Each structure stands twice: as C-alpha cells, then as structure tokens.
Design a protein with these regions (language model features):
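A eukaryote-biased signal for short, well-structured alpha-helical docking elements
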Residues: 1-39
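Short extracytoplasmic
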Residues: 40-76
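Short acidic, flexible loop segments centered on an aromatic residue
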Residues: 73-83, 136-139
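Short aromatic-acidic-glycine turn motif
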Residues: 79-93, 142-145
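Short proline/glycine- and polar residue-rich coil/turn motifs
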Residues: 97-99, 107-114
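Low-complexity, intrinsically disordered segments enriched in Ser/Thr together with acidic residues
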Residues: 111-128
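Serine/threonine-enriched low-complexity regions used as flexible
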Residues: 128-143
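Short beta-strand edge segments in extracellular beta-sheet folds
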Residues: 147-150
Length: 150
C-alpha cells in the first residue's frame, strides 16, 4: 500500500512537470521555444521557434533593412536538405530556387531604406536537432538550431 502511494505521488509530479513544460513551450510555441537571433552587423533579425514537431508547420519571421535598391536574395541552408519541406513565403518572392541544399528567395524590386519583413513557413519532415543558416545578400548569416520532436 505504501508503494502504491509513493508511485502515485511520483506519477503526479512527472505529469505536472510534463504539463508545465508544455505550457512554457518546451514542445512547441511558448516562452522557452520562442527565439530571436540577430546577425553580427545587427542588420538582419530572425524570430523563430526552437522546438517543433515533425509534420507540423512552423514559421520564421526575417526582418531586414534594404541597403541598396534592386535585387535582394534570402538564402536558407539546412544541415540536411531533407529535414524541411518549404511552405509558403509571404510576401511571395519574385523567384525561388534551390541549389546544393540551399533555398534561395529573390526579391527584384526593393527600394533602398525599406524595412522588409518576410514570413517563411516550413514543415519539418525529420525528427532531430538541425543546424541552419539564413542570410540576406552578402550580409553575415544567422546560425540557428531547431529541435524537432517525432
């Protein structure tokens, strides 16, 4: 009988810990999961979720200031090219292509001084910890990681 009581108490503590972890975002969106990274020159900012679930869409917001009128290219490189399936991008780029494990999004008609915010939606197709790099033009890249639960 004492064993059953102890087992019930331990089970309650474990269940409570799982619920608290989920509420703070350890398994997806939340305080622990939400992250912001800025590149070395402080010209590009990325808001994203550190934790996600396989086959569940997640979003990233990339903010940058256009330094020269004309074409701007955003590149997203994942450690494993099969780790993510690209989804929608808003605003839509004028062209988009991939080469060597890197996804390129090209915006042709941007004006100097514009503050641009791009939303990128991706769906993780594999579980694990993935290291990624996102870059705008020739600016220093932002390295970030995501842990994807099965």
């Amino acid at each position: 009988l004492k064993f059953e009581y102890i087992f019930r108490q331990v089970g309650f503590v474990i269940l409570l810990a799982i619920i608290v972890a989920a509420l703070v975002g350890l398994f997806s969106q939340g305080v622990v999961s939400s992250a912001e990274k800025i590149n070395a020159t402080k010209s590009v900012r990325l808001d994203y979720e550190r934790f996600g679930r396989r086959q569940t869409e997640s979003r990233m917001q990339l903010n940058f200031l256009v330094k020269a009128a004309g074409k701007s290219t955003i590149s997203l490189t994942a450690e494993n090219s099969n780790a993510y399936e690209p989804g929608s991008v808003w605003p839509q780029p004028d062209s988009m292509y991939s080469h060597g494990g890197t996804l390129y999004m090209v915006y042709d008609e941007l004006k100097k001084g514009d503050s641009i915010s791009v939303w990128i939606f991706i769906t993780p197709s594999r579980a694990g910890k993935w290291n990624n790099v996102i870059r705008v033009n020739n600016e220093p890249g932002i390295q970030f990681w995501q842990f994807i639960y099965p």
